[in-house]
């Protein structure tokens, strides 16, 4: 191409000569894919030429045209029944569309072409995800879901991003539960950005349940298994001596640290414990914000609020399923009491004390709780 075609292509206005140059090359390669009598089209060669044209257009910042060339590469790879190559070309096309959208928003402050590049990117990445799943690569599929979700969140579409974060969590859960919990946490944050507080509460509740299921310490489970006796093993042939009972049982431990106990501190891994703390605090704040009527209060939400009532206070500040530090638990308990009594001044004082203990997201929820207490809407938020 001529050197001046870069600016004209990047700006979206094509004089006839530059347009003819690109279109002539594109049509020339496309003609090689047409079926002719007694001649088989050379699909591999056409795919390589489309890829070369895409690289040239990308170097000239002609992003949408480079993306369309990558889609042509994907069609060639599909004709060759090469799934990995097709997925790679679709992913590259989607990234070019996303880059076009981000550049347009930075320069113009509005979506490019009424958001069509964003829709094209979502479609291409969705096809790539399906291909990776067909190839038995759920981790790669989840990574693409996370990439699309992060892009949607960056361009101001948190509601759409939340769905892709949840799909990534679903793909990660069987093999990487901690990554799945992180994706669910991102989805919950997107729900909060979209002001879908009911959906965020449901996600935090699900996260808490999954963290308890997958966060058990493996050492505790191993302690419950019989231990082989020390020393040389007897030969396999002949009668085997019966092992002594004392050699197969774990050593006695204090009641608070017995194997299989429900005490969370030694039994939950640190990362999962952090997830439990975040979910517990966020769920309490969301329940205070939404103020669901008793008829619509789910049992798990009712149990959460009951833990912070004075009647359930057991002298240690929390039950055995909690992970909160005692100071934070007592402050949350006071906050629940103040919110139930509509004590605005008490909530303001607690907000000052709780501010350094909460995340920015949780502090925003606490601010919304205070605003709802000052100016109640009658229906939560």
Curated annotation (Swiss-Prot):
Keywords for this protein: Acetylation, Cytoplasm, Endosome, Nucleus
Residues annotated with N-acetylalanine modification: 2
Protein name as catalogued: 40-kDa huntingtin-associated protein
Oligomer status and interactors: Interacts with HTT (via C-terminus). Interacts with RAB5A. Found in a complex with F8A1/F8A2/F8A3, HTT and RAB5A; mediates the recruitment of HTT by RAB5A onto early endosomes.
GO BP terms in the entry: negative regulation of proteasomal protein catabolic process; vesicle cytoskeletal trafficking
Chain coiled-coil ranges: none
Segments of this protein annotated with the region Disordered: 221-265
Motif, Nuclear localization signal: chain positions: 34-36
Subcellular localization: Cytoplasm; Nucleus; Early endosome; Nucleus, Nuclear body
Disulphide bridges, residue numbers: none
Tissues with expression: Produced abundantly in a wide variety of cell types.
Gene3D superfamilies found in the cross-reference section: Tetratricopeptide repeat domain
């Amino acid at each position: 191409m001529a050197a001046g075609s870069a600016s004209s292509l990047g700006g979206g206005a094509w004089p006839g000569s530059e347009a003819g140059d690109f279109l002539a090359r594109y049509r020339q390669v496309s003609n090689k894919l047409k079926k002719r009598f007694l001649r088989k089209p050379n699909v591999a060669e056409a795919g390589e030429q489309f890829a070369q044209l895409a690289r040239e257009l990308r170097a000239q910042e002609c992003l949408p045209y480079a993306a369309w060339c990558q889609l042509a590469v994907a069609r060639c790879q599909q004709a060759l029944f090469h799934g990995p190559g097709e997925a790679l070309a679709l992913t590259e096309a989607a990234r070019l569309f996303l880059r076009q959208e981000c550049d347009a928003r930075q320069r113009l402050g509005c979506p490019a072409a009424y958001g069509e590049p964003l829709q094209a990117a979502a479609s291409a990445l969705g096809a790539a995800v399906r291909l990776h799943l067909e190839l038995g690569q759920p981790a790669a599929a989840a990574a693409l879901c996370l990439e699309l979700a992060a892009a949607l969140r960056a361009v101001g579409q948190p509601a759409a991003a939340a769905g892709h974060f949840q799909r990534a969590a679903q793909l990660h859960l069987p093999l990487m539960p901690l990554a799945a919990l992180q994706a669910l946490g991102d989805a919950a944050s997107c729900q909060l950005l979209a002001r879908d507080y009911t959906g965020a509460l449901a996600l935090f509740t699900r996260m808490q349940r999954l963290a308890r299921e997958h966060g058990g310490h493996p050492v505790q489970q191993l302690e419950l298994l019989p231990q082989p006796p020390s020393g040389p093993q007897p030969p396999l042939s002949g009668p085997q001596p019966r092992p002594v009972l004392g050699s197969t049982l774990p050593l006695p431990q204090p009641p608070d640290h017995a194997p299989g106990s429900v005490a969370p501190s030694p039994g939950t891994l640190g990362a999962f414990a952090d997830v439990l703390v975040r979910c517990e605090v966020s769920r309490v704040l969301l329940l205070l914000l939404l103020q669901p009527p008793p008829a619509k209060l789910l049992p798990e939400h009712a149990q959460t609020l009951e833990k912070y009532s004075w009647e359930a206070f057991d002298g240690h500040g929390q039950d055995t399923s909690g992970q909160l530090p005692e100071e934070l638990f007592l402050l949350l308990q006071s906050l629940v009491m103040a919110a139930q009594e509509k004590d605005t001044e008490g909530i303001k004082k607690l907000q000052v004390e709780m501010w350094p203990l909460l995340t920015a997201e949780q502090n925003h929820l606490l601010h919304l709780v205070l605003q709802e207490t000052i100016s109640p809407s009658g229906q939560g938020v």
